[in-house]
Regions:
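Phosphopantetheine-dependent thiolation modules in NRPS/PKS and related acyl-activating systems
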Residues: 1-34, 38-43, 48-76
Length: 76
């Protein structure tokens, strides 16, 4: 599991964001497109792509994309 791959898959969940705009230190909850529905989309993507079940708590406790990546990696 690689961080850059996770960032690309994370970015693909957004309609208006380009993967090149996303970096590991992006505070994703501050993005204009972020919503509770986006959180559900990320939870589903992580389950489908990585076979890991994350919870809303994991997203709430993560500030950056890399923080969330580290949570997913620790559960894998």
């Amino acid at each position: 599991m690689e961080l850059q791959d996770f960032i690309k898959k994370f970015a693909s969940q957004f309609d208006t964001m380009d993967a090149s705009e996303m970096t590991a230190d992006v505070e994703f909850k501050a993005l204009d497109e972020w919503s509770s529905l986006m959180a559900l989309s990320i939870i589903a993507m992580v389950d489908e792509e990585y076979g890991v079940a994350i919870k809303g708590k994991d997203i709430r406790e993560s500030e950056t994309i890399e923080d969330l990546f580290n949570v997913v990696k620790s559960l894998k």
